[in-house]
């Protein structure tokens, strides 16, 4: 990479750090290309992304962002996972690390909050925004559905009684 490419990469990574809801930093020593591709595809499916960056460039890109507190995590072979949904990147990274012990989560950040490895794991155990929205909609819809069932039940019962009475008269 020449200087111009490095500057462009640093500015791009800086924008990614500023826009993301959460960032996860992990060591990936020993992961095969297939495993790394699998991690990238799972993260992409969750709406996030995975990047391998030189530690020095990542530290420069962190300057001026809320996530600046995680710059000390960039030692060794590090990979950065990030997503707009604050739960998506930690959830995918933790699930992948459970199945593959070569991905070691070092920590991360959510906004200005710096997280250690346990913080990332506890963040991953929370439901995602979509799951929370689905639960909220379900809670709102349940009373309306019950009300609809209760109001339609008497009409249905009357229709069944009239139908039974009509069948009884036809049989007689």
UniProtKB/Swiss-Prot annotation:
Disulfide bonds: none annotated. InterPro entries: Ribosomal_uL10, Ribosomal_uL10-like_sf, Ribosomal_uL10_bac, Ribosomal_uL10_bac_type, Ribosomal_uL10_CS_bac. CDD domains: Ribosomal_L10 (cd05797). One of its GO terms (molecular function) is large ribosomal subunit rRNA binding. It comes from the Bacteria. One of its GO terms (cellular component) is large ribosomal subunit. Coiled coil: none annotated. One of its GO terms (biological process) is translation. The keyword tRNA processing does not apply. Keywords: Ribonucleoprotein, Ribosomal protein, RNA-binding, rRNA-binding. Belongs to the universal ribosomal protein uL10 family. Forms part of the ribosomal stalk, playing a central role in the interaction of the ribosome with GTP-bound translation factors. Part of the ribosomal stalk of the 50S ribosomal subunit. The N-terminus interacts with L11 and the large rRNA to form the base of the stalk. The C-terminus forms an elongated spine to which L12 dimers bind in a sequential fashion forming a multimeric L10(L12)X complex. This is Large ribosomal subunit protein uL10. It comes from Brucella anthropi (strain ATCC 49188 / DSM 6882 / CCUG 24695 / JCM 21032 / LMG 3331 / NBRC 15819 / NCTC 12168 / Alc 37) (Ochrobactrum anthropi). The gene is rplJ.
